[in-house]
């Protein structure tokens, strides 16, 4: 009688072996499904802004390049370097105390500051008939002990923080180039002695039309010639990088002359009203801090 094979146990073993691949396949499907879900979820979170997208190396390079090529914002007007060689523009008005540490250095026109007591807190070093050359050499300033010293030495002793210069009306008859050379030397000396001071140059003030035509005008001074000298002074201000304060904006009329009523006596020197105009202009034309 043939041997009958018992298949019950065999079939059970086959079913066990067949179940392993199916289990692996199911696990792989679950794993890939989870991965796909993570990718989709991650993209949704990036799109919604919940997380930041990771940049590639190329993207980072592009960002750096963009930063390097983007121009910086311009500095504010208060931070910009001052422009020299042009008249100082209007600025915020300062108080009279601004001139506490200032010296006004000049000729007979500057003398009027003391004469009319316009700015009593400011120191004045001036002399009638002075010019840029004699300001360095002529001993015309009397000290407290009676000794006489030059204007430039008096300025050195005063050691001001601000210096306002006005010299030139007595030099109009000179050769212009000679005058400017002398003026340049005077400026160099002042700047060397006072390296930290704010230096303001003021133009030669105009004369009246009446005096321009007067027989008393022995040196044939004209406002046109004064203007030519002032252009040279302005150029020096640019070269030396000091400030030019164009006070003639408030002293001259529409023709460029000093109004006749401003100087009825001699056509050159003016009265207290015009000194007040002068100083009001200075208060609104100061160097940036």
Report the location of each language-model feature.
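N-terminal Lys/Arg-rich, disordered targeting/topogenic segments
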Residues: 1-19
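Conserved SGNH/GDSL esterase-like catalytic core that processes O-acyl groups on lipids
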Residues: 92-181
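Second-shell loop/turn segments in exported
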Residues: 137-141, 169-178, 190, 216-223, ...
């Amino acid at each position: 009688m043939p041997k009958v094979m018992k298949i019950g146990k065999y079939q059970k073993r086959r079913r066990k072996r067949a179940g392993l691949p199916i289990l692996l396949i199911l696990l792989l499907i679950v794993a890939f499904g989870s991965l796909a879900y993570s990718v989709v979820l991650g993209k949704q979170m990036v799109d919604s802004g919940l997380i930041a997208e990771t940049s590639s190396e190329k993207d980072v390079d592009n960002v750096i390049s963009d930063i390097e090529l983007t121009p910086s914002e311009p500095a504010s007007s208060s931070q910009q370097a001052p422009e020299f060689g042009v008249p100082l523009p209007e600025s915020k008005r300062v108080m009279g105390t601004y001139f506490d540490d200032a010296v006004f250095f000049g000729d007979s026109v500057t003398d009027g500051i003391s004469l009319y007591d316009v700015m009593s807190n400011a120191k004045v070093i001036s002399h009638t008939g002075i010019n840029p050359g004699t300001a360095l050499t002529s001993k015309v300033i009397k000290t407290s002990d009676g000794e006489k010293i030059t204007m430039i030495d008096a300025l050195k002793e005063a050691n001001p923080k601000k210096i306002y210069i006005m010299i030139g009306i007595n030099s109009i008859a000179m050769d212009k180039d000679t005058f400017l050379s002398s003026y340049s030397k005077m400026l160099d000396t002042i700047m060397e002695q006072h390296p930290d001071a704010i230096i303001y140059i003021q133009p030669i003030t105009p004369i009246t039309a009446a005096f321009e035509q007067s027989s008393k005008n022995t040196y044939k001074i004209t406002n046109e010639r004064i203007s030519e000298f002032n252009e040279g002074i302005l150029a020096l201000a640019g070269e030396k990088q000091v400030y030019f304060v164009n006070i003639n904006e408030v002293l001259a009329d529409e023709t460029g002359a000093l109004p006749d009523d401003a100087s009825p006596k001699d056509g050159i020197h003016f009265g207290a009203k015009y000194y007040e105009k002068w100083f009001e202009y200075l208060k609104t034309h100061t160097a940036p801090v």
